[in-house]
């Protein structure tokens, strides 16, 4: 499958799940996965989802601006870099964000091995 198509499909699935059913993200991570969220490192699928479901907002909408990807390693991994806007319910202004995913191929499916998220305040 075309890497750009895989990246686009992953990004659409990830953010639609985040916006509508954050606990559902658990299947995208494994116990060896790591999230760096605003500088805080969290390891393991359960811990990552606990962090994401514990954020101080319940409703949000991600609007994706760009998706870039590159193949990573001989085993079919992929780097995916995303930028966009995060609109929180009840807030007038959206927050700009960047997020990088390192996806690892596992029997025809992908899981998130590394995930780095930052809000962009500039």
Curated annotation (Swiss-Prot):
What are the subcellular locations of this protein? Answer: Cytoplasm; Nucleus; Nucleus envelope
Q: Which PROSITE patterns match?
A: NTF2_DOMAIN
Pfam families linked to this entry: NTF2
Where would you say this protein principally sits, based on its record? cytoplasm
Spell out which residues are annotated as carrying N-acetylmethionine.
1
One GO biological-process annotation of the entry reads: protein import into nucleus
Listed GO MF terms: small GTPase binding
Question: Which terms in the GO cellular component ontology are assigned?
Answer: cytoplasm; cytosol; nuclear envelope; nucleus
Superkingdom is: Eukaryota
Q: Which InterPro entries match?
A: NTF2, NTF2-like_dom_sf, NTF2_dom, Nuclear_transport_factor_2_euk
Q: Keywords for this entry?
A: Acetylation, Cytoplasm, Nucleus
User: What does the annotation give as the result of altering residue 38 to K?
Assistant: Loss of interaction with RAN1 leading to impaired nuclear protein import activity
Q: Does the keyword Nucleus apply?
A: yes
Keyword Cytoplasm attached: yes
> What Gene3D superfamilies does the record point to?
3.10.450.50
NTF2 domain mapped to chain residues: 6-119
What does the subunit comment say? Interacts with RAN1.
State the function annotated in the UniProt record: Facilitates protein transport into the nucleus. Interacts with various nucleoporins and with Ran-GDP. Could be part of a multicomponent system of cytosolic factors that assemble at the pore complex during nuclear import.
Q: What is this protein called?
A: Nuclear transport factor 2A
Say which species the protein is native to.
Answer: Arabidopsis thaliana (Mouse-ear cress)
* Encoding gene per record: NTF2A
């Amino acid at each position: 499958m075309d890497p750009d198509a895989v990246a686009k499909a992953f990004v659409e699935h990830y953010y639609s799940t985040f916006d509508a059913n954050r606990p559902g993200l658990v299947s995208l991570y494994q116990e060896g996965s790591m999230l760096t969220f605003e500088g805080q490192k969290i390891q393991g699928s359960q811990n990552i989802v606990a962090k994401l479901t514990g954020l101080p907002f319940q409703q949000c909408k991600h609007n994706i601006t760009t998706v870039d990807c590159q193949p990573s390693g001989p085993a079919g991994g992929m780097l995916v870099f995303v930028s966009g806007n995060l609109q929180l319910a009840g807030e007038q202004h959206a927050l700009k964000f960047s997020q990088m995913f390192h996806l690892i191929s596992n029997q025809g499916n992908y899981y998130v091995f590394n995930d780095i998220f930052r809000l962009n305040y500039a």
